[in-house]
Amino acid sequence: MSATPVTQLTPSSQPQQPCLPLLGASVTELTSWVQQQGQPAYRGKQLHDWIYHKGVRSLTDISVFSKQWRAAVADVPIGRSTIHHRSVASDGTVKYLLQLSDGEIVETVGIPTDKRLTVCVSTQVGCPMACDFCATGKGGYKRNLERHEIVDQVLTVQEDFQQRVSHVVFMGMGEPLLNTENVLAALRSLNQDVGIGQRSLTLSTVGIRDRISQLAEHHLQVTLAVSLHAPNQALREQLIPSARSYHIEDLLAECREYVAITGRRISFEYILLAGVNDLPEHALELSKHLRGFQNHVNLIPYNPISEVDYKRPSGDRIQAFLTVLQQQHIAVSVRYSRGLEADAACGQLRTKTSR
């Protein structure tokens, strides 16, 4: 998995401008870049440390560099956002609205649990998938996020909490597999530059044809989470419009191939909607799809939003669905979302400034 080069290495007597902000670049890329500016190679490692571990937001603030060189590269962007809005839920979950260099707003969430700190990152401004139950898709889609804009979300939460981020889930605004190049580059950087283990990184997708198979070719150790949300094609099309062009059987075939190639278990996300997909017969139908390969089901009781009429099932209905899957020997757990008061829970990531 390789990141986009920081700069075209063309000879120049003037400090060269990287084609992308420096955040997201590897130590090798940064070393090549500083050498092109006439600096010794060891400056690349220093620059890497200041960007990823000291939180520098401008090259002019790196005190180990000469004032002359800092002035020469003052306009080279590192690629950090600014916090536009911050809201805190009673459970400690923090939702951030981050303003990017072009003025767009994206959302990220910091989720503290015991000794862990998990960050839920966005991969697009808005989302084109328009899932019927999700708040994010109601605001439309604008563009993909660049690699630095994804990595920045993690550093922002880490700095705000003053605690090392232990886990990152790509479950915020957007469909990651519609932004594969930047997502893969961000995964590389989070692993190798920020220092988060691959198995502590989770990539979520509703399923884009052929993209899961392509992801398998990278032999990553990240966790793949597939948003299934229905046990059959007709119901899935009702909830996820993009499913009309990608049959559930084809999606599951790609998932089986992914497990065979990577040896990694897949997580299936299943939002429980009262009276829609939460009946025992739905659970039984779901179980038949999941036999014969490594997987785990996360049941997610729905978080109601004002724009749609879906409701959260009762506790008894949730337990009944869970019991059927357990009786069918399917690995399953219930995941209750955090941060409800901050509008930060799964499916509620929405840019307030667009309302």
From Swiss-Prot:
Binds 1 [4Fe-4S] cluster. The cluster is coordinated with 3 cysteines and an exchangeable S-adenosyl-L-methionine. It catalyses: adenosine(2503) in 23S rRNA + 2 reduced [2Fe-2S]-[ferredoxin] + 2 S-adenosyl-L-methionine = 2-methyladenosine(2503) in 23S rRNA + 5'-deoxyadenosine + L-methionine + 2 oxidized [2Fe-2S]-[ferredoxin] + S-adenosyl-L-homocysteine; adenosine(37) in tRNA + 2 reduced [2Fe-2S]-[ferredoxin] + 2 S-adenosyl-L-methionine = 2-methyladenosine(37) in tRNA + 5'-deoxyadenosine + L-methionine + 2 oxidized [2Fe-2S]-[ferredoxin] + S-adenosyl-L-homocysteine. Keywords: 4Fe-4S, Cytoplasm, Disulfide bond, Iron, Iron-sulfur, Metal-binding, Methyltransferase, rRNA processing, S-adenosyl-L-methionine, Transferase, tRNA processing. InterPro entries: Aldolase_TIM, Methyltransferase_A, RlmN_N, RNA_MTrfase_RlmN, rRNA_lsu_MTrfase_RlmN/Cfr, rSAM. SUPFAM superfamilies: Radical SAM enzymes. The keyword Membrane does not apply. It is an enzyme of class 2 (transferase). Belongs to the radical SAM superfamily. RlmN family. This is Probable dual-specificity RNA methyltransferase RlmN. It comes from Trichormus variabilis (strain ATCC 29413 / PCC 7937).
